[in-house]
Design a protein with these regions (language model features):
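A short, solvent-exposed beta-edge/loop patch
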Residues: 74, 118-157
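C-terminal motif of bacterial Sec signal peptides marking the signal peptidase cleavage site
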Residues: 16-20
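Bacterial signal peptide processing site
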Residues: 22-25
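Short, compositionally biased low-complexity segments enriched in polar/charged residues
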Residues: 48-79, 92-96, 124-125
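A short acidic-to-branched-hydrophobic micro-motif
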Residues: 79-89
């Protein structure tokens, strides 16, 4: 009897362990992440950067990322900017993170103090976030940055 109970307990334990070994949750689709961000942050006055901007400013060519979208202000009175990159794998995502970090540093280093001084805190407080193979950055107001982050993180819930 003891042996039967031990075998049943061992089988139950093995079954529990196997069911807990499910694969990682699938990452959200790029379009779903951009839609979530667009619903949280007013991007209506922003324009999408083209491949030449991405290459010139980030040093990234098509093929260095699976998908990307960089939105730049279309208004000359603010510096709002929001970017989302998706790498094909973890190593590509790490390279994207480095490229975005370098880009944000370039923006800081090239800032002219007399140009829109009230906007400079947005650049100083710019943030970069990563989740899985995604890299996102935001040069936005405090509220805009928080809304973008909340929308981004909500996609990975």
């Amino acid at each position: 009897m003891k042996k039967t109970v031990s075998i049943l307990l061992a089988c139950a334990l093995a079954l529990c362990l196997l069911s807990a070994c499910g694969g990682e949750a699938a990452e959200p689709e790029f379009g779903d992440v951009t839609a979530a961000i667009d619903s949280a942050v007013d991007t209506s006055s922003m324009t999408e950067a083209d491949a030449s901007y991405i290459q010139g400013m980030f040093g990234l060519r098509e093929g260095d990322y699976e998908a990307c979208r960089v939105l730049l202000t279309g208004v000359g009175t603010n510096i709002d900017e929001l970017g989302l990159f998706k790498g094909a794998d973890a190593s590509q995502a790490e390279r994207l993170k480095t490229a975005v970090t370098d880009y944000l540093q370039l923006r800081l280093n090239s800032w002219m103090p007399e140009y829109l001084p009230d906007e400079f805190p947005k650049l100083q407080n710019a943030k970069l976030w990563t989740e899985g193979s995604y890299v996102m950055y935001a040069i936005l107001s405090d509220d805009g940055r928080e809304a973008a982050l909340e929308a981004f993180e909500g996609c990975f819930g």
